[in-house]
Amino acid sequence: MSEAPPLATEHLTRVVDGEALVEDVSIEVRAEEVFVVFGPSGSGKTSLLRLLNRLDEPTRGTVYLDGTDYRDLDPRTLRRRVGWVPQAPTLIEGTVAENVAWGPTLRGEPVDTERLHDLLDRLGLSGFADREGNRLSGGEAQRVAIARTLFNDPDVVLLDEPASSLDAAAADRVESLLADVMEAYALTAVLVTHDANRARRLGHRGARLQHGRVTATGDLDTVLRASD
């Protein structure tokens, strides 16, 4: 019997005011891969991502984590297992270390400072632990947001165009460091992007989304050719 994928959707649909934002989406994300959800603005990419960790409720269909229907998981467990990195970072008041350790601190868990510093090092933030979060550049703040999500040790990471709000140089650096840390930690991720070059740099397989529906899925060449 084959092992269940870390994340899969089955006929996932969300309808709001009669409009299908996401319609009948069935995908599988394999272990240790970056699965790209590709498509133009307004195609339903972020709407799909919000369904994957139940920030929004599906009208029909569901999501499975390692074969378990995510409706059977309590919200706190689900949020921990499925991490989210938004387009624009929102940091709490405090130091970089306090931001990264925010999740374990809220849960009353001990903070693994060695792992925290290793994560900062891998994201190009060596020596940043004691800096105030409100004194960082946009690229630095986004890397802290990535570190905060990864420090929770999620099973799957959702990346909602994590470099789209940055200038070209900062975006390139974030993407390069993100690719390195994803490989180093053997992470499984879903990346939303409208940028074909970004998809090729970071992704392994993917799906093309148009008007909320999957129009192509599989290897990235197939998916990106479908958008030409």
Q: What do the PLM-derived regions correspond to, one by one?
A:
Residues 111-128, 179:
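Conserved ABC ATPase "signature" region
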Residues 153:
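Conserved catalytic motifs of ABC-family nucleotide-binding domains
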Residues 157-161:
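Catalytic Walker B motif of ABC-type/P-loop ATPase nucleotide-binding domains
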Residues 168-170:
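Helix N-cap at the start of a conserved alpha-helix in ABC-type nucleotide-binding domains
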Residues 69-83, 106:
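ABC ATPase NBD coupling module
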Residues 53:
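Helix-to-loop junction immediately C-terminal to a conserved catalytic motif
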Residues 132-136, 140:
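Conserved ABC ATPase signature
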